[in-house]
């Protein structure tokens, strides 16, 4: 029994010496005593290859490469102890979830924290850390007693409570495992106990290579190996000079020196002979003087400089993508020009979550075979999502999001139906569910679902059409596809008495969906497309899910569990599932994390993402215990994993290892921006390397080849996939700026694409963007007639839409596009309710021959309640009756109608104008409809402007009959003559023209009528500010002012007084007008003369004619208006269709000048030739 150390700096040949000794021993005595070669888990594959890579050693039974966990398996299989069921990380998280749920009421700190994402991962890591450091539940309990007895501050009490919670959960966890299960850490503890009984290990020659430190648990294994084995050889990365000096925590080899001393202490305790240490002083790894210099002088202060040509390269990249592309280009150059193999190259990084997806895509495009050494979660695989969302459907009462997350896994689709067909149908089905607000009991009810196209309050009694019936049948068929398997599982879960039966329900759910066959089809499809990584994913995920169900049953099978807890525990287990890494092929670039990698035989290393806060790492206080709390526990005698401060001290050693892996070339790079364009800073580590190699030039990597010389651009010609974008850059620059000279070799590259059979079609689609102009071509006469017909019938809103943006009009009325219908109460729905409610009250008053002035306050309240109750079941598929929230909203809407009724009552008392009709149709056909506004366009097309007028009021005096238009609005609005001029506000003047033009046929007494004005009535329930001692009358007066109607009224004092008979002088509380003492109008009055009203009406006709002409002649310009802070695009539903982009040459707003009303009126006169 002896111990031997082999020490030396990085690259000194420690592993080579050990492997050579083993190989020589195998050549001399192939059947001798066991040789154990222990390495970290991530080194086992490459070490096994190196061991049998010698020509003289093609295989061996005597020598085996192990990690600690693999050695545990080997020993336990030999001496017993492996009969207990192994639970993996997912099983641990599930068990912890169950323990926490059952203990929740007794927890102090973790009761709420348990609901946070990642809690069980942190808790599992904490318990694993306890085990690795030989901390038992009783140790934690004793620590809690000590802390509880001496805690006075809030921080101390928090730590005491946290330790108490940890002790409870750790103890429950250990009790659940006793005699039944083993987790990963338990194997190492069992290994310590069983090693003395192992004949396989007894007398073995043991090599321990590649470790820098050992946990207390691992140190105990080393102790037993020294006791049981013949000799233990341990390699450590230490400079021999360090051992002759006092240990300093700032020393580069501080961690490995401590490990050296700990192992020697163990050997002394066990009276193990300590052989003479073998120090290795040479640097056989490095074939480059520069890399040898970097290793030898890495920690020197001040930095030792290396002059001359160096094999160290520093790059700064414009962004992360440019950085990765630069790496890819250099890898291809090394392989093509310097005879490198891909396996000779490694890429090291730390923030893999930012890089892996980009690297996977770009390395594939550059045809670089690669292996990413990462653990990928299974949480996004369709199978995992299907199980999780199906359980959420059941436990969450069939919420929309859970249902369609399950649908979109496509595992609910019947096996014999084309996926493409099902996707289209399910999209339609989802639209239906969104429009009808389907959730909850509607999914489980046997009542068939109905489909009707109507949404209007006036269109509720239509007969079902054939197309509606066909759609209804499809919807019910798709409903059964979705709900049937889930309902079957739901029933089984409710009947289940134990966890075993609940797991069986999940298994049967998957089997009845033919999931294994569907996954096999996905695997075959992935293989056919050459994506072998994802092909194996589909195999792995089924095996892992089945293993998870088995583990669940083994651990908790006979227990009873609520459905919600079962869902939570299952979800916790599913979140922990990870894809196993498939060993790399013989010739791939290895992409690995700096902290986990243990590289060997690498000629070139690319260290990427060397940004501040990443390399070296910024301090991060994460996990269950903070650094301060760990320090408290450490002071009390509980040793745990290093604190953030200790980890930061070890960063220098990590970076030293990072830059000493390669034998020939080292590349260091950093991006200046991330994928979102946020600025990143270069690491101070790059400055250190620059000081060591002052002759090395920091080169800049860009995505834009136009920034490079022609000689530099040639390196950007790589594979057809990636080069196409650079050809585009060159051609765009040439086209836009017409630079002097020619495109040199880029024309040759261009010719390759346009002549290649494989790339001709692909490249033409991309290259066509060179000539892309986001312009909508004018429709031909034939197309225009097909879309709009020979007779156009449109509302005023449609005409206004055309003037806002011709393309938006084309999208809505030509292509008939519309937004997805969502089951929610929008502004148009509320507006429709307000109109309907006020019309019903007014109709009732007309039938009773009463006016608004006749109503009492109580009647206003009663009528508002009655009409809202009548309308609620008719509005938007009964949305106001669908939930408590909407019921509350219904009450608020009733209050608004009540308040509006009171105001209309006050207006009626103060006005000579009375409503003569509401919701007056024109051009709609049928009894009571006024004629449309008709136009014969120059191209022969007939156009009718139609609509419905909210309210028409009439007043009479000795001067004749006057008519005014009242338009109800759910937001404040005024008539802007500038908008009238630009054709953006034509509605009110159109309505006024229709009623006055048709007065002789419309009014019961016949005759003519003059325009009195157009006014907007804002329906709302305002809040007013008043003094604390204000009376109720004063408050009501202030509220009345908030309802002042804005618009444009006839500039006739008598007519204005008809509108407000309380007005003598001053401003009216009812309309936007006021009178001075001399009888003239105040400056702020919104008035127009009768002649001006006539001019405005002529202008409306003129504008409609122009609009009609443009529509029928196919004008669909993408030319939205912009006026001040208003723009057509702000609330447009078609932005994703037109792709309007101000950065494009052809896409600019039509900027409309804001004008005073007088200026706008003058321009209107000019247009129509008015006086």
From Swiss-Prot:
Gene3D superfamilies registered for this protein in UniProt: 3.90.320.10, 6.10.140.1030, P-loop containing nucleotide triphosphate hydrolases (3.40.50.300)
Pfam family name, one: UvrD_C
Assigned EC number: 3.1.-.-
UniProt cofactor note: Binds 1 [4Fe-4S] cluster.
InterPro entries, per the entry: ADDB_N, DNA_helicase_suAddB, DNA_helicase_UvrD-like_C, P-loop_NTPase, PDDEXK-like_dom_sf, PDDEXK_AddAB-type
One of the GO BP terms on file: double-strand break repair via homologous recombination
Molecular function in Gene Ontology: 4 iron, 4 sulfur cluster binding; 5'-3' exonuclease activity; ATP binding; double-stranded DNA binding; helicase activity; metal ion binding
Binding positions (ATP): 8-15
Cofactor requirement: Mg(2+); [4Fe-4S] cluster
Binding of [4Fe-4S] cluster, residues: 805, 1129, 1132, 1138
Domain UvrD-like helicase ATP-binding: residue ranges: 1-343
Alphabetical keyword list: 4Fe-4S, ATP-binding, DNA damage, DNA repair, DNA-binding, Exonuclease, Helicase, Hydrolase, Iron, Iron-sulfur, Metal-binding, Nuclease, Nucleotide-binding
All copies of domain UvrD-like helicase C-terminal, residue ranges: 281-587
SUPFAM superfamilies tied to this protein: P-loop containing nucleoside triphosphate hydrolases (SSF52540)
Function of the protein: The heterodimer acts as both an ATP-dependent DNA helicase and an ATP-dependent, dual-direction single-stranded exonuclease. Recognizes the chi site generating a DNA molecule suitable for the initiation of homologous recombination. The AddB subunit has 5' -> 3' nuclease activity but not helicase activity.
Subunit comment: Heterodimer of AddA and AddB.
Remarks, miscellaneous: Despite having conserved helicase domains, this subunit does not have helicase activity.
Family under the similarity heading: Belongs to the helicase family. AddB/RexB type 1 subfamily.
Protein name: ATP-dependent helicase/deoxyribonuclease subunit B
Gene name as annotated: addB
């Amino acid at each position: 029994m002896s111990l031997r150390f082999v020490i030396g700096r990085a690259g000194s040949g420690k592993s080579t010496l050990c492997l050579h000794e083993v190989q020589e021993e195998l050549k001399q005595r192939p059947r001798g005593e066991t040789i154990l070669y222990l390495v970290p888990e991530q080194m086992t594959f490459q070490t096994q290859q190196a061991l049998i890579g010698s020509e003289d050693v093609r295989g061996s039974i005597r020598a085996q490469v192990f990690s600690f966990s693999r050695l545990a398996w080997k020993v336990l299989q030999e001496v017993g102890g492996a009969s207990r069921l192994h639970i993996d990380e997912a099983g641990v998280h599930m068990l912890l979830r169950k323990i926490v749920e059952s203990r929740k009421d007794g927890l102090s700190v973790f009761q709420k924290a348990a609901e946070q994402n990642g809690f069980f991962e942190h808790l599992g890591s904490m318990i694993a850390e306890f085990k690795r450091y030989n901390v038992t539940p009783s140790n934690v309990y004793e620590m809690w007693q000590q802390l509880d007895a001496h805690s006075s501050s809030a921080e101390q009490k928090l730590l005491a409570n946290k330790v108490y919670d940890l002790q409870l959960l750790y103890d429950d966890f250990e009790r659940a495992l006793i005699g039944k299960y083993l987790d990963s850490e338990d194997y190492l503890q069992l290994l310590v106990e069983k090693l003395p009984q192992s004949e396989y290990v007894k007398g073995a020659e043991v090599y321990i290579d590649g470790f820098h430190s050992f946990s207390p648990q691992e140190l105990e294994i080393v102790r037993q190996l020294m006791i049981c084995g013949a000799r233990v050889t341990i390699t450590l990365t230490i400079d021999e000079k360090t051992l002759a000096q006092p240990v300093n925590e700032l020393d580069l080899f501080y961690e490995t020196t401590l490990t050296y001393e700990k192992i020697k202490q163990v050997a002394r305790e066990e009276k193990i002979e300590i052989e003479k240490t073998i120090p290795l002083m040479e640097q056989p790894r490095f074939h480059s003087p520069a890399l040898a210099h970097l290793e030898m002088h890495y920690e020197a202060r001040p930095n030792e400089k290396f002059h001359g040509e160096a094999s160290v390269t520093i790059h700064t990249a414009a962004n992360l993508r440019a950085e990765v592309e630069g790496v890819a280009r250099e890898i291809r150059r090394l392989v093509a020009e310097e005879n490198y193999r891909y396996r000779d190259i490694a890429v090291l990084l730390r923030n893999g979550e930012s890089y892996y997806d980009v690297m996977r895509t770009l390395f594939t495009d550059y045809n670089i075979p690669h292996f990413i050494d990462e653990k990928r979660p299974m949480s996004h695989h369709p199978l995992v999502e299907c199980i999780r969302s199906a359980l959420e459907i059941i436990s969450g009462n069939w919420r929309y999001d859970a249902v369609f997350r399950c649908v979109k896994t496509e595992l609910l689709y019947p096996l014999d139906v084309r996926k493409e067909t099902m996707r289209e149908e399910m999209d339609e089905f989802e639209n239906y569910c969104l429009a009808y607000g389907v959730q909850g009991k509607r999914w489980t009810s046997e009542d068939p679902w109905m489909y009707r196209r109507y949404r209007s309050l006036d269109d509720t009694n239509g007969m079902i059409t054939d197309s509606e019936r066909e759609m209804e049948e499809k919807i019910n068929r798709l409903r059964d596809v979705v709900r049937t398997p889930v309902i079957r599982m739901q029933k089984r879960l409710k009947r289940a008495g134990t966890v075993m039966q609940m797991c069986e329900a999940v298994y049967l759910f998957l089997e009845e969906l033919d999931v294994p066959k569907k996954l096999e089809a996905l695997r075959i499809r992935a293989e056919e497309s050459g994506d072998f990584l994802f092909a194996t994913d589909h195999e792995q995920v089924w095996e892992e899910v089945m293993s998870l169900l088995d583990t669940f049953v083994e651990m908790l099978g006979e227990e009873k569990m609520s459905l919600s807890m079962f869902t939570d525990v299952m979800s916790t287990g599913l979140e922990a599932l990870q894809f196993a890494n498939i060993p790399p092929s013989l010739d791939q670039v290895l992409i690995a994390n700096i902290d986990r990698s243990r590289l060997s035989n690498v000629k070139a290393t690319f260290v990427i993402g060397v940004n501040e806060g990443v390399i070296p790492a910024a301090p991060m206080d994460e996990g269950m215990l903070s650094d301060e709390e760990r320090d408290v526990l450490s002071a009390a005698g509980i040793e745990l994993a290093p604190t953030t401060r200790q980890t930061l001290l070890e960063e220098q050693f990590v970076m030293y290892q990072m830059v000493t892996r390669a034998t020939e070339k080292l590349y260091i790079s950093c991006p200046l921006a991330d994928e979102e364009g946020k600025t990143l800073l270069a690491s101070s580590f790059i400055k250190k390397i620059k000081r060591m190699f002052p002759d090395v030039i920091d080169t800049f990597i860009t995505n834009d080849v136009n920034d490079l010389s022609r000689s530099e651009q040639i390196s950007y010609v790589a594979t057809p996939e990636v080069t196409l974008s650079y050809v585009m850059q060159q051609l765009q620059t040439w086209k836009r700026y017409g630079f002097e000279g020619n495109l040199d070799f880029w024309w040759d590259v261009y010719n390759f694409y346009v002549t290649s059979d494989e790339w001709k079609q692909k490249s033409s689609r991309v290259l066509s963007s060179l000539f892309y102009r986001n312009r909508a071509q004018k429709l031909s006469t034939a197309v225009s007639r097909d879309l709009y017909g020979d007779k156009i019938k449109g509302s005023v809103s449609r005409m206004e839409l055309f003037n806002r943006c011709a393309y938006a009009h084309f999208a809505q009325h030509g292509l008939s596009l519309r937004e997805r219908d969502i089951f929610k109460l929008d502004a148009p729905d509320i507006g429709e309710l307000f109109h309907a409610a006020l019309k019903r009250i007014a109709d009732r008053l007309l039938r009773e021959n009463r006016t608004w002035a006749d109503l009492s306050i109580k009647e206003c309240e009663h009528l508002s309640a009655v009409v809202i109750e009548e309308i609620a079941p008719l509005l938007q598929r009964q949305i106001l009756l669908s939930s408590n929230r909407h019921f509350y909203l219904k009450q608020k809407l009733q209050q608004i109608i009540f308040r509006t009724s009171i105001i209309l009552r006050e207006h009626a008392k103060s006005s000579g104008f009375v409503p003569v009709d509401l919701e007056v149709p024109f051009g709609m056909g049928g009894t009571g409809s006024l004629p449309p506004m008709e136009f014969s366009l120059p191209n022969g097309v007939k156009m009718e402007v139609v609509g419905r007028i909210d309210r028409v009021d009439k007043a009479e005096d000795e001067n004749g009959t006057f008519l005014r238009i009242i338009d109800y609005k759910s937001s404040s609005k005024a008539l802007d003559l500038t908008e009238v001029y630009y054709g953006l506000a034509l509605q009110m003047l159109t309505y006024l023209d229709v009623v006055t033009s048709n007065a002789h046929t419309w009014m019961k007494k016949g005759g003519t009528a003059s325009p009195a004005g157009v006014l907007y009535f804002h329906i709302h329930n305002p809040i007013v500010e008043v003094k604390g001692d204000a009376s109720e009358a004063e408050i009501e007066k202030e509220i009345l002012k908030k309802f002042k109607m804005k618009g444009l009224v006839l500039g006739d004092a008598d007519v204005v007084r008809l509108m407000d008979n309380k007005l003598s002088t001053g401003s009216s509380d009812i309309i936007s007008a006021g009178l001075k003492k001399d009888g003239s109008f105040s400056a702020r009055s919104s008035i127009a003369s009768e002649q001006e009203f006539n001019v405005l009406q002529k202008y409306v006709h003129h504008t409609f004619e122009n609009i009609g002409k443009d529509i029928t002649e196919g004008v669909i310009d993408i030319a939205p208006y912009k006026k001040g802070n208003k723009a057509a695009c702000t609330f447009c539903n078609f932005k994703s269709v037109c792709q309007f982009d101000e950065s494009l040459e052809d896409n600019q707003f039509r900027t409309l000048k804001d004008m005073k009303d007088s200026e706008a009126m003058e321009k209107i006169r000019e247009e129509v030739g008015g006086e």
